[in-house]
A protein has these predicted regions:
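C-terminal motif of bacterial Sec signal peptides marking the signal peptidase cleavage site
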Residues: 20-24
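Extended ligand-binding regions for polar small-molecule ligands
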Residues: 26-28, 34, 38-39, 84-93, ...
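Ligand-binding clefts/hinges and TM-proximal coupling segments of bilobed small-molecule sensing domains
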Residues: 27, 40, 44, 174-191, ...
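Extracytoplasmic small-molecule ligand-binding "clamshell" domains
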Residues: 36-123
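Short helix-initiation/N-cap motifs at beta->coil->alpha
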Residues: 99-110, 171, 189-203
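A ligand-binding cleft/hinge motif common to bilobed small-molecule-binding domains
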Residues: 124-132, 180, 202-203, 207-236
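Periplasmic-binding protein-like
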Residues: 142-149, 217-258, 278-297
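Flexible hinge/capping segments at coil-to-helix
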Residues: 149-166
Length: 297
């Protein structure tokens, strides 16, 4: 698909989406605060309360380190991206330092349940199943699934699938869950990280890659020779911060913070600083959720 066609595709893909929630990062990813760094012996989730985080002077936030423009490490070794921008503001308003902990999609829940992180800001789509294991705060972005393929073999439908072909997914994502439930006969190639999935796709190991539509659209815009033939697959969802199940003090603070940030249009500023170069400004209002209010755009 030619470059000038991308605006119409992106508009169709994103205006129908409900809400996007992004993730945020910090300054280091090798350390976590002492409190809550290991799982309880009985297997129950462990977490630090809001006061404990304040007393420690550091909040541990799980973010992606390889998913540009949402969460990635730049050439200077610094975390950048939409989620990182938000994470730094959380730390600033809480009055603590941010310790960024690199996470993969498959271990987001585990990192919360074992106390490795206090908050996950890593493109975490809200689903009923996940909500049984973690507590989601109010959303800050809209998202649905999308499928990208090569220009010379554009995939526009998953019906009548060739059994010899496969689709790449990242383990622990909604794309994996959706395809297993709705297209059980389609072979899946599963990878643990965005980077390994991207490399495999570029090497031609599968004919398509399914992921959040914002991510596959960004990939196609940034890499010649690829088209998002399915810009919206399944239902529209939202992305939100997540904390350990039962950590009400931290959850309530984050929800109040999201409302306060909405009054200054913080997530629009975040978008313009981190996502505008990829998606442009025309889609800002359809992607951003302010104040946790999905229908307030």
């Amino acid at each position: 698909m030619k470059k000038f066609e991308w605006k119409s595709v992106l508009a169709l893909a994103l205006t129908g989406v409900l809400a996007l929630g992004l993730t945020a990062c910090g300054s280091s990813d090798s350390k976590t605060a002492d409190a809550g760094s290991a799982a309880a012996a009985d297997g129950k989730a462990v977490y630090r309360t809001l006061d404990e985080i304040k007393e420690s002077g550091t909040i541990n936030i799980g973010v992606f380190s390889d998913k540009n423009p949402f969460g990635y490490v730049d050439e200077n070794g610094e975390y950048q991206g939409y989620d990182v921008y938000y994470a730094r503001r959380l730390g600033e308003d809480l009055g603590v330092d941010v310790n960024f902990v690199s996470t993969e999609a498959a271990n987001r829940i585990e990192y919360l349940q074992t106390g490795k992180v206090d908050v996950i800001l890593a493109n975490f789509t809200v689903t009923p199943v996940r909500a049984e294991e973690v507590d989601f705060a109010s959303p800050y972005m809209n998202v649905s699934l999308g499928v990208v393929s090569k220009d010379d073999n554009v995939i526009t439908s998953l019906d009548n699938w060739n059994a010899d072909d496969s689709i790449i997914v990242i383990s622990g994502t909604t794309a994996e869950t959706y395809l297993i439930a709705n297209y059980p006969d389609i072979p899946l190639q599963k990878f643990d990280s965005y980077a390994t999935a991207k490399e495999a796709f570029e090497n031609g190991t599968s004919v398509a890659w399914a992921n959040d539509n914002t991510e596959v659209i960004a990939f196609a815009l940034q890499n010649e020779g690829y088209t998002v033939g399915i810009p919206s697959l399944g239902s529209a969802d939202t992305i939100a911060p997540a904390v350990s199940k039962g950590n009400t003090t931290l959850l309530d603070w984050i929800n109040d913070e999201i409302v306060a940030l909405g009054e200054e249009n913080f997530f629009h500023a975040d978008y313009e600083a981190t996502l505008a170069d990829t998606y442009g400004l025309d889609y800002e209002d359809s992607l951003v959720v302010e104040g946790g209010k999905v229908n307030a755009q």
